[in-house]
Amino acid sequence: MTVFSPLSAPRLNRFVLLALLCLPLAACATEDQKAEKRLAAEIAEQEPVENLYNRAAKRLDDGVFFDAAKLFDEVDRQYPYSQWATRAQLMSGYAHYRNMRYDEAVMALDRFIELHPGDESIAYAHYLRALCFYEQIVDVRRDQRTTELALENLQRVVDRFPDTVYARDAMLKIDLTRDHLAGKEMEIGRYYLQRNQHQAAINRFQRVVDQYQTTTHVPEALHRLVESYLALGIRAEAQKSAAILGYNFPESRWYKDSYALLGDKNMPAPKRSVYDRTLGRLFN
């Protein structure tokens, strides 16, 4: 009879969990392999380029993005020096993007950008490349390398193609991306603050104030600086942060908290928000 040691149970569970996590990836790989075999059977060598390209475009219109990407790649492979190949490289990137295969999309777009830097669609290629990173932004508790790449690529679109519709949309996404990066700094700062590592917390909160001034996290960052400096007994710096908070965000709940925390009658009292004033008129 087989006897399982209690000491081996956690390790066994880890193996089971790992196997379960790998199941979706294995299923996805199997489906891709089936699709590739099916496509290989229907693709003829030296098929007329127009037919091959139109077939790829039809799959794209039908939402069969994996097939579309592979067929566009086939156009590029069979007719590498044609005008069809130039368009197919870009469309392959788009099809991979729609299929959420962002690494493959970036590879296809990099090829297009390298080979055709003067193409009329080059701004769109850079914009689509930026979106490949933007769509992968995850919550602030995870590594933000992808967020940084999104910001870098979106900024490139704005800098290189400022008068395009892509630049205008990129600017909106830059604001959201910067807000996300500021959120990550706040998450780390709170972590340090909760563990009484006040100098480390101050560094994070100050970075939000200095580098992400237009984000929604600045009022809280200033209040957390007040908390951190008071915890270290540096009241003058706490008052300075509170003064900046009160000047820029006098109606903020964070200024109210800082005002109460400092108990400094020389500081301007927090202003009532428009919401509070409206309620006061309604019920008084």
Residue spans for each PLM region:
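Acidic, polar-rich low-complexity tracts and alpha-helical solenoid repeat scaffolds
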Residues: 2-7, 28-284
